[in-house]
From Swiss-Prot:
NCBIfam families: atpA, PRK13343.1. It comes from Cronobacter sakazakii (strain ATCC BAA-894) (Enterobacter sakazakii). This is ATP synthase subunit alpha. Produces ATP from ADP in the presence of a proton gradient across the membrane. The alpha chain is a regulatory subunit. Its EC number is 7.1.2.2.
Length: 513
């Protein structure tokens, strides 16, 4: 075979002409230390705060400490096989999670990856987990209710759309139960829900998911999970990921509800990350910015005006306001609400529901202490019928608690005092409610009307529960149009008052409880 020099030179020229030089600039660094999920990297001169750093094995770390000659980052996932000398790259991206309607009904981890075995998640795009909260001009006042389905909460501590209402109490006082019931009550309200589980047992979360499914609320809910076995970094970031998923609905003129269960564990995870990054500790060994940790998260829960929604959707949605309502949960130690994290979150939120161990153990469930529970903005959002009928409930309970304490020392009580004590006991009994049994506005209105207008006076204390059950069954069976009307309008006028009075009179005549 004879080589033709002309052909060879032509072939080389063609190859040179077709040769495509692709050059990529990578900001590359070297791992200099690995310990407890925290890595120190040398050489990442252009790294941003919060930037994702690409690690070997398709993993990422987040840059949290930018120092003069190194970067401190926390690994998102397993880190046992990382070693000194390994090369890492900057990505130029802040941590993002998938958002959209496809996430409803799914259980995902902090990074938005599905963990429920139902296949890949359908999403409408990605959103950064850290977003600046809407400004003052973009907000609208809270004036629409979020019904929790609990008589004691909706009557005395009402929650509005766009509000931040803290649920606080010791362990085993029913905090999660209250939040889950609030989610179950939204299944027909059109409010989308996000439940963020932080640092809990996997078995507990599985039980919550099963209960949501049983009550038909899972299809309306996104469950974001960072279990106790996951790294502190994932537990610290889980609430921000859940918030980004909830903001998707708020920014498109819809209403969403997010539950953070619980922020005490998030603060502990953040403390762990901060100490590993060698940040200086402060009170209770928490870092100096633990207030900002929660304030920047909870400020994102808001009600935004129609102009904000229109600008965000580029005119696709007009004349609609959006809201994200937050129910953060805080666990206290022996009822100490003056500890560091509880006082921080109390000062950030728009009110708190305080659950007490003593009330819970004495059978008063939900164990709400109406004396120190408050809603600072929810009153404007309360439905008309509940607002009108609930005024005397808080007063009756306050007077009852005062008299009950006094009556322990008094041997003989006058008739008026005995009557007040009896009424207070019956109202307390009436406000008891079983778990997974949220009540509609009409049912609450009817029960409050009975308490307010003295229909409980001749009912024995032991029969209050059966009286309520029989009354609600009677109303749903024989007065369905009235109940439907109240549920639709939430209104209260002389006509509705007259109908409720005749309903209760006819029910009392049956003596069927």
């Amino acid at each position: 075979m004879q080589l033709n020099s002309t052909e060879i030179s032509e072939l080389i020229k063609q190859r040179i002409a077709q040769f495509n030089v692709v050059s990529e600039a990578h900001n590359e660094g070297t791992i200099v230390s690995v310990s407890d999920g925290v890595i120190r990297i040398h050489g990442l001169a252009d790294c941003m705060q919060g930037e994702m750093i690409s690690l070997p094995g398709n993993r990422y770390a987040i840059a949290l400490n930018l120092e003069r000659d190194s970067v401190g980052a926390v690994v998102m996932g397993p880190y046992a096989d990382l070693a000194e000398g390994m090369k890492v790259k900057c990505t130029g991206r802040i941590l993002e999670v998938p958002v959209g309607r496809g996430l409803l009904g799914r259980v995902v981890n902090t990074l938005g990856a599905p963990i429920d075995g139902k296949g890949p998640v359908e999403h409408d795009g990605f959103s950064p987990i850290e977003v600046i909260a809407p400004g003052v001009i973009d907000r609208q006042s809270v004036d629409q209710p979020v019904q929790t389905g609990y008589k004691s909460v909706d009557a005395m501590i009402p929650i509005g759309r766009g509000q931040r209402e803290l649920i606080i109490g010791d362990r085993q006082t029913g905090k999660t139960a209250m939040a889950i019931d609030a989610i179950i009550n939204q299944r027909d309200s059109g409010i989308k829900c996000v439940y963020v589980a932080i640092g809990q047992k996997a078995s507990t979360i599985a039980n919550v998911v099963r209960k949501l499914e049983e009550h038909g609320a899972l299809s309306n809910t996104i469950v974001v999970v960072a279990t106790a076995s996951e790294s502190a970094a994932l537990q610290y970031l889980a609430p921000y990921a859940g918030c980004a998923m909830g903001e998707y609905f708020r920014d498109r003129g819809e209403d969403a509800l997010i539950v953070y269960d619980d922020l005490s564990k998030q603060a502990v995870a953040y403390r762990q990350v901060s100490l590993l990054l060698r940040r200086p500790p402060g009170r209770e060994a928490f870092p100096g910015d633990v207030f900002y940790l929660h304030s920047r998260l909870l400020e994102r829960a808001s009600r935004v005006n129609a102009e904000y929604v229109e600008n965000f959707t580029k005119g696709a949605v007009k004349g609609k306001t959006g809201s994200l309502t937050a129910l953060p949960i805080i666990e206290t130690q022996a009822g100490d609400v003056s500890a560091f994290v509880p006082t921080n979150v109390i000062s950030i939120t728009d009110g708190q529901i305080f659950l007490e161990t003593n009330l819970f153990n004495s059978g008063i469930r939900p164990a709400v202490n109406p004396g120190i529970s408050v809603s600072r903005v929810g009153g404007a959002a309360q439905t008309k019928i509940i607002k009108k009928l609930s005024g005397g409930i808080r007063t009756a309970l306050a007077q009852y608690r005062e008299l009950a304490a006094f009556s322990q020392f008094a041997s003989d009580l006058d008739e008026a005092t005995r009557k007040q004590l009896s009424h207070g006991q019956k109202v307390t009994e009436l406000l008891k409610q079983k778990q997974y049994a949220p009540m509609s506005v009409a049912q609450q209105g009817l029960v409050l009307f009975a308490a307010e207008r003295g229909y409980l006076e001749d009912v024995e204390l032991a029969k209050i529960g059966s009286f309520e059950a029989a009354l609600l069954a009677y109303a749903d069976r024989d007065h369905a149009p009235l109940m439907q009307e109240i549920n639709q309008t939430g209104g209260y006028n002389d006509e509705i008052e007259g109908k409720l009075k005749s309903l209760l009179d006819s029910f009392k005549a049956t003596q069927s409880w």
